Amino acid sequence: MQXDIMIFTIGPA
């Protein structure tokens, strides 16, 4: 999940 959160933080943000 952490990994996913890192990608999500720099993806849509």
UniProtKB/Swiss-Prot annotation:
More about this protein: On the 2D-gel the determined pI of this unknown protein is: 5.2, its MW is: 52.5 kDa.
Protein name: Unknown protein CP 10 from 2D-PAGE
